Amino acid sequence: LLEGAPAHRRGLVASLASAASEVGALLAVGVSAVTVASMDEASLQSWGWRIPFLVGAALAGAVWIARSRMEESPEFHRQKAAGTVPESPLRHCLGKHRAAIGRAFAISALGSITYYVGITYVPAFLTSAGALSEKASLWLSTIAAVAVIVVTPFVGALSDRIGRKPVLAALSLGNVLLPMAMFSLMASGSHERALAGAVILAALAGGVSAVGAVATAEQFPGEGRVTGLALGATGATAIFGGLTPFIAQLLVERTGAAIAPGAMIAVVGLCVLPLFISMKETAPLRPPKTRQLSG
């Protein structure tokens, strides 16, 4: 998507892919909710639980067909024509793009912890903290997911207009200052405060996801880009992704501090902020606007 997008619209196009992943998550919740609501307990336990998986399998098949018919990006065709496709992408990346791998790691680290702690973990936090019932926390998380879908394209478009660097730096600073207060709000027992905290956390995570999608890819030239992303971005997701909700819950239980998950996000935000401030801008220069002379 990014390599085939117009240079001055890469942020928006890449952010739409991030927003689409949230649409998929909402669809999963919706299919599950309809299945549960439309069946009795015995039927659900016997065979009904398979319905969401069957819907997912059908969608996966449709996506596979669509992906199999996609053409290679113009960037890859350029590399083939120029004879610059690396024979060993891994050696090429480790030899020439180690710093870029580190930057991609930092961007993805912030994106991963904001998503997995600031969105994925929130329903469990609300339920375990006793602030909301399980049903209420799931509805609240659904609203937060909608907020992500709305925010993401706007942040992607903003990064096209003012650049990736200022957007990343601002979001990093926001993730230093706000998450602890938001988790404190969500633990207050008030539905309104919990909603505000969850939506703000979701907006921060969606913003990082939006600009991170394009900023990580732009750290590398076309040659070795996918390998660089696999090493940097995917590596950070493995570290700061799946286990962080478990660690967040463990910290809450051991310390009794509701703000502990927010502190996790803040620490990562503080660590990557200096890098975001000092890194070079990767967004292409916007084409100058031409004025039409009258008369």
Q: Over which residues does each language-model region extend?
A:
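Cytoplasmic membrane-interface "Motif A"-like loop-to-helix N-cap segments
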Residues: R161-S172
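A late C-terminal transmembrane helix in Major Facilitator Superfamily
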Residues: G222-R254
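Extracytoplasmic gate region of multi-pass secondary transporters
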Residues: H97-V148, G241-P245
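C-terminal ends and interior cores of transmembrane alpha-helices
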Residues: L173-G189
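Flexible cytoplasmic inter-helical loops of multi-pass small-molecule transporters
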Residues: S68-P89, L285-R291
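Glycine-rich segments within core transmembrane alpha-helices of 12-TM secondary carriers
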Residues: G11-V36, L231-T244
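Multi-pass alpha-helical transporter architecture, strongest
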Residues: V63-S68, A266-G295
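Helix-loop-helix hairpin linking two adjacent transmembrane segments in secondary transporters
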Residues: S21-R67
